[in-house]
């Protein structure tokens, strides 16, 4: 059990190592080629999402819902919701380039990351070393419990399916295929799936990571930023549904918060440097 926790903790800190590697690569190559620029944007996005989302509200929603429903259903709903939110945020961020030059957007993004870094540093220093996510987890559990009450009647209505299942065994192949397609559609768009989708979507709306994606997408490599964020969200959602509640109670929120602040300060320096070296 201890080894599993250690492995989970290492996986949770993997984005931090990725960010360090991306920063080192950027420092070594001041005059970067197109491919290395794409890779830098991609790794920055993955690392930012990884550190921002571990233990976040959307992470806890996926972790707690996975204890009540099928993990595949929870993962598909959470990952789809976050992917759509990320794509919309990226498109909104890149559209700002139409009104401002790349130099100004990079400068504003750098200032934004400085503010985020400062706020996270203050939050981290005010936390105790043993600070956890118990309070936020209790809030999410209460929210889920209220919404689950509306699903109880649906579970009762499924009691008469045995007779239909017997008829299906004797049905033709065509009818069986149609039934499987209908089952898949009802699985993907079931009330539970929609509930998880909306809870994650609304939980991410206006979040620090969403605003960061908007800022990062002002760069010319915005599709790589979007791709990195989508993959980062998918990794975090996967961790959440597999063992998110255990992981969230074992990691140090103070450490994650301070590591995130350091990452935002690094991003701020990179974007401000880009603002002063970019030629319009």
From Swiss-Prot:
GO cellular component: cis-Golgi network; fungal-type vacuole; fungal-type vacuole membrane; Golgi apparatus; Golgi medial cisterna
Family matches, as InterPro entries: GDT1-like (IPR001727), GDT1-like_CS (IPR049555)
Function recorded in the entry: Divalent cation:proton antiporter that exchanges calcium or manganese ions for protons across the Golgi membrane. Mediates the reversible transport of calcium or manganese to the Golgi lumen driven by the proton gradient and possibly the membrane potential generated by V-ATPase. Provides calcium or manganese cofactors to resident Golgi enzymes and contributes to the maintenance of an acidic luminal Golgi pH required for proper functioning of the secretory pathway. The transport stoichiometry remains to be elucidated.
Source organism: Saccharomyces cerevisiae (strain ATCC 204508 / S288c) (Baker's yeast)
Subcellular location field: Golgi apparatus, cis-Golgi network membrane
Entry protein name: Divalent cation/proton antiporter GDT1
Protein's membrane topology: Multi-pass membrane protein
UniProt record similarity statement: Belongs to the GDT1 family.
Chain ranges passing through the membrane: 4-24, 46-66, 72-92, 105-125, 184-204, 223-243, 256-276
Residue intervals annotated with topology Cytoplasmic: 1-3, 67-71, 126-183, 244-255
Disruption phenotype: Growth deficiency in the presence of high calcium concentrations.
Molecular function as annotated in GO: calcium ion transmembrane transporter activity; calcium:proton antiporter activity; manganese ion transmembrane transporter activity; manganese:proton antiporter activity
A Pfam family it matches: GDT1
Keyword annotations of the record: Antiport, Golgi apparatus, Membrane, Transmembrane, Transmembrane helix, Transport
Reaction equations catalysed: Ca(2+)(in) + n H(+)(out) = Ca(2+)(out) + n H(+)(in); Mn(2+)(in) + n H(+)(out) = Mn(2+)(out) + n H(+)(in)
GO biological process, one term: intracellular calcium ion homeostasis
Domain of life, source organism: Eukaryota
Vacuolar topology ranges: 25-45, 93-104, 205-222, 277-280
Induction or repression: Expression is GCR1-dependent. Promoter is also bound by the RAP1 transcription factor.
């Amino acid at each position: 059990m201890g080894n599993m926790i250690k492995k989970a903790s290492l996986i949770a800190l993997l984005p931090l190592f990725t960010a360090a590697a991306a920063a080192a690569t950027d420092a070594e190559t001041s005059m970067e080629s197109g491919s290395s620029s794409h890779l830098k944007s991609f790794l920055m996005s993955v690392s930012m999402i990884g550190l921002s989302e571990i233990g976040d509200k959307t992470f806890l929603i996926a972790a707690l819902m996975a204890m009540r429903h099928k993990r595949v259903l929870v993962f598909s709903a959470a990952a789809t919701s976050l992917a759509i939110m990320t794509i919309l945020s990226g498109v909104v961020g890149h559209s700002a380039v139409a009104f401002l030059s790349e130099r100004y957007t990079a400068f504003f993004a750098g200032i934004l990351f400085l503010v985020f870094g400062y706020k996270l540093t203050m939050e981290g220093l005010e936390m105790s070393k043993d600070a956890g996510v118990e309070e936020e987890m209790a809030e999410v559990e209460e929210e889920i419990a209220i919404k689950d009450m509306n699903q109880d009647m649906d579970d009762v209505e499924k009691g008469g399916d045995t007779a239909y299942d017997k008829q299906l065994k004797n049905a033709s192949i065509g009818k069986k295929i149609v039934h499987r397609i209908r089952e898949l559609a009802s699985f993907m768009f079931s009330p539970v799936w929609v509930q998880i989708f909306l809870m994650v979507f609304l939980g991410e709306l206006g979040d620090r990571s969403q605003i960061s994606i908007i800022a990062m997408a002002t760069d010319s490599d915005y599709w790589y930023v979007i791709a990195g964020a989508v993959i980062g969200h998918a990794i975090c959602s996967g961790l959440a549904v597999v063992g998110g509640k255990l992981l969230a109670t074992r990691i140090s929120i103070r450490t994650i918060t301070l590591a995130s602040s350091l990452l935002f300060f690094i991003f701020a320096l990179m974007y401000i440097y880009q603002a002063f070296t970019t030629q319009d």
